[in-house]
From Swiss-Prot:
It comes from the Archaea. This is Exosome complex component Rrp41. The gene is rrp41. Belongs to the RNase PH family. Rrp41 subfamily. GO terms for cellular component: cytoplasmic exosome (RNase complex). It comes from Thermoplasma volcanium (strain ATCC 51530 / DSM 4299 / JCM 9571 / NBRC 15438 / GSS1).
Length: 248
């Protein structure tokens, strides 16, 4: 994220609307589809704003090599990757520091939600491929990954759902756009398990006051109610389609 005080880009207009016409607490359009990869144990595709991300889940299976096994529970290995064509400037192939950090925090968030104790010595691989990037890819990828895990039939305590909020032109806004992410004052990605309210991912880039932080997190929690329903609808739609096809 680029934070610059010299930037003169105005991100909020005189009508208190953002550059894309949204109000402060309005989400970008979100579409999720489950079961999109035939050879994966579970999969999902998400479009969130301009983001396009596909997720494949493989496992639980015996962890290999054996020294990577945990005798008490499964190990969740998320691999987040941005395709070379996913951003305007061509990205060098292979993992970098950012993708490794995002892979780690997604692995930890998913591990909190999965009943990993049911699968000792196993591993669950989660491949997250960003086909098109438009701000908030870690949260969009995580939100799709939990749908893919459910599609794989892996038992979970709850599905993980997240969103971002941030500070733009002095205002707290929900679900940052690419321009807001690049030129805003702060970005706060957050993910929770809705049933318990447990926070499984929370980061911040930039500066906000304590009141602004609570405003941002409250805005995210409210938004997750809508996103959670989109997740569940994706799974219901998949099984509805399978039921129709099975009855033919």
């Amino acid at each position: 994220m680029i934070k610059t005080e010299t930037s003169k880009i105005k991100l909020i207009n005189e009508d208190n609307l953002r550059l894309d016409g949204r109000s402060f607490n309005e989400l970008r359009p979100i579409k999720i589809e489950a079961g999109v990869l035939n050879r994966a144990d579970g999969s999902a595709y998400i479009e969130w704003g301009g983001n396009k991300i596909i997720v494949g889940v493989y496992g639980p299976k015996e962890a290999y090599p054996k020294h990577s096994q945990d005798i008490d529970h499964a190990v969740v290995k998320a691999r987040y990757n941005m395709a070379a064509f996913s951003v305007d400037e061509r990205k060098r192939p292979g993992p970098d520091r950012r993708t490794m950090e995002i892979s780690k925090v997604i692995s930890e968030a998913l591990s909190s939600s999965i009943m990993i104790e049911q699968f000792p010595r196993a591993e669950i691989d989660v491949y997250i491929e960003v086909l098109q990037a438009d701000a908030g890819t870690r949260i969009a990828g995580l939100t799709a990954a939990t749908v893919a895990l459910a599609d794989a039939g892996i038992p979970m305590r709850d599905m993980v759902v997240g969103c971002t909020a941030g500070k733009v032109d002095g205002h707290i806004v929900l679900d940052l756009s690419k321009e807001e992410d690049n030129f805003g004052e702060a970005d706060i990605p957050m993910a929770i398990m809705p049933k318990t309210g447990e926070i499984v991912l929370l980061q911040m880039d930039g500066d906000v006051t304590e009141d602004e932080f609570y405003e941002a997190t409250s805005m995210i929690i409210e938004a997750t109610k809508k996103i959670s329903q989109i997740q569940r609808n994706a799974l219901l739609n998949k099984y509805k389609i399978e039921g129709i096809e099975g009855g033919e």
